């Protein structure tokens, strides 16, 4: 996996659920974290110096190629519906993946990137919690 110690991480989000906990977890791993939100001026100025960028703003293709440092890792947490000219809908992230992947060294796709990992971790945690309830005598085996 990616060693975070000493890396510059920019989180472009403003979320009590994702942003703050993730920022604290990243800092605990030794990363220097900058959190940008809707009131941040010149978001691209911050993101262009980052080794890792995490994007969760709810705006389709918000994060473009002019916002990323060559070789950076980009984690797209956004899930957006985009209507196509034929009336169909497709799921896209907050990152313009087709453009950014030419510059970044690593990028998560949407769909199929962060979502399946989240589901897997939730299932693992639910299993651990259930086992602990059995061990504590709260549930029958």
Where would I find each of the regions flagged by the language model?
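Glycine-rich phosphate/diphosphate-binding loop of Rossmann-like nucleotide-binding domains
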Residues: 1-73, 77, 82, 88-90, ...
